[in-house]
Amino acid sequence: MTDAGKRILVMAGGTGGHVFPALAVAKYLAQQGWQVRWLGTADRMEARLVPQYGFDIDFIDIKGVRGNGLVRKLAAPFKVVRSILQAKAVIAEFKPDVVLGMGGFASGPGGVAAKLAGVPLVLHEQNAIPGMTNKLLSRIANQVLCAFKNTFTQVKAKVVGNPIRRELIALGAEPKQAADDALKVLVVGGSLGAKVFNDLMPEVVAALSKQQSITVWHQVGKDNLTGVKSAYQQQGQEGGVNVAEFIDDMEAAYRWADVVLCRAGALTVSELAAVGLPSILVPYPHAVDDHQTRNAQVLVEAGAAFLLPQAILDVNKLVSKLQLLANDRAELAQMGQRARDVAVLDATEQVAQVCIALAEKG
């Protein structure tokens, strides 16, 4: 189906969990002949990332207010009104047929501006607990979409999964490689790393290696490379460990791994399901409304992951879980299959089709 000449304004920013699913939808619609424009903020990751994918981006001046000081909260209403007017000007100039909000600071003013301009508004919530912006906008949106069931309680929402890259969906369909003797553990802590993983894993590997052959690919985050490498060396474990500040090729990392130790961001959970990998999930304890714990439950309840809250995490618990998986490769394989079984593989197409249908209705 082609829709040459149709226009969409995509609103997403702040974190990869918002931006990457939105990019998947934007790329899909661009391939259908749509014109795509982005609305974001100049000081967050979308300002750098979106132009790299070939999309034009407009900026509005807006910041979050949750947990900020009194002065900022008092000034917030005036700044919100200004940002709505800025978004309305973008809409008036671009004339989109539909507006898609996928989270981040710009989505709030942009969503209100879309409603004021009479442009159909579609929302997509990636997390199991909706963010404040989507919770408010859900009452005025034409269509509310979500990745997980029971996300919204006050409005009717359609469960469509999280849009992810096609390469990862294809990876999940590949035949699994025969397991080596060594358990291959991928440790991912996000762009800044996870201090708890960086602190514990050198000791975990040292303890495990006395009983079990293990190799580790550990993404430690910005400015943590030297310290974590040194910690592995002090434990005599530098030989079987690949320590990296960032992992640019997550497809290669997922293909390599037998099991993943990571946080439970919405995109991470959806990617683990799509590629069919078992995991040990340690939700970020300071996430708003503890939404990462709810995200994790999707895989935990399917029998595809173990949940270890950070408050109780220690070397012994990690050693115990990894030893269990190393000793039972059949269970490891079954956990991976259970992960794949709960994956929603056509989320990108579902979100795009909702946008297409609303644009055609006018």
UniProtKB/Swiss-Prot annotation:
Query: Could you cite one Gene Ontology molecular function of this protein?
Result: undecaprenyldiphospho-muramoylpentapeptide beta-N-acetylglucosaminyltransferase activity
Q: Any coiled-coil ranges, and where?
A: none
Question: Reaction(s) catalyzed by this protein?
Answer: di-trans,octa-cis-undecaprenyl diphospho-N-acetyl-alpha-D-muramoyl-L-alanyl-D-glutamyl-meso-2,6-diaminopimeloyl-D-alanyl-D-alanine + UDP-N-acetyl-alpha-D-glucosamine = di-trans,octa-cis-undecaprenyl diphospho-[N-acetyl-alpha-D-glucosaminyl-(1->4)]-N-acetyl-alpha-D-muramoyl-L-alanyl-D-glutamyl-meso-2,6-diaminopimeloyl-D-alanyl-D-alanine + UDP + H(+)
Q: Name one Pfam family in it.
A: Glyco_transf_28
Which terms are listed as keywords in the entry? Cell cycle, Cell division, Cell inner membrane, Cell membrane, Cell shape, Cell wall biogenesis/degradation, Glycosyltransferase, Membrane, Peptidoglycan synthesis, Transferase
Identify its membrane topology class: Peripheral membrane protein
Q: Which GO terms describe its biological process?
A: carbohydrate metabolic process; cell division; cell wall organization; lipid glycosylation; peptidoglycan biosynthetic process; regulation of cell shape
Membrane-spanning segments: none
Q: A single GO CC term, please?
A: plasma membrane
Keyword Cell cycle annotated: yes
Q: Which InterPro entries match?
A: GlcNAc_MurG, Glyco_trans_28_C, GlycoTrans_28_N
EC number(s) per UniProt? 2.4.1.227
Can you say where in the cell this protein is located?
A: Cell inner membrane
- Is Cell cycle set as a keyword in this record? yes
- Where does the chain bind UDP-N-acetyl-alpha-D-glucosamine? 15-17, 127, 165, 191, 247, 266-271, 292
Give the pathway: Cell wall biogenesis; peptidoglycan biosynthesis
Query: What is its EC class?
Result: transferase
Summarize the protein's role. Cell wall formation. Catalyzes the transfer of a GlcNAc subunit on undecaprenyl-pyrophosphoryl-MurNAc-pentapeptide (lipid intermediate I) to form undecaprenyl-pyrophosphoryl-MurNAc-(pentapeptide)GlcNAc (lipid intermediate II).
Give the UniProt family note.
Answer: Belongs to the glycosyltransferase 28 family. MurG subfamily.
Can you name this protein? UDP-N-acetylglucosamine--N-acetylmuramyl-(pentapeptide) pyrophosphoryl-undecaprenol N-acetylglucosamine transferase
| Designated gene of the protein | murG
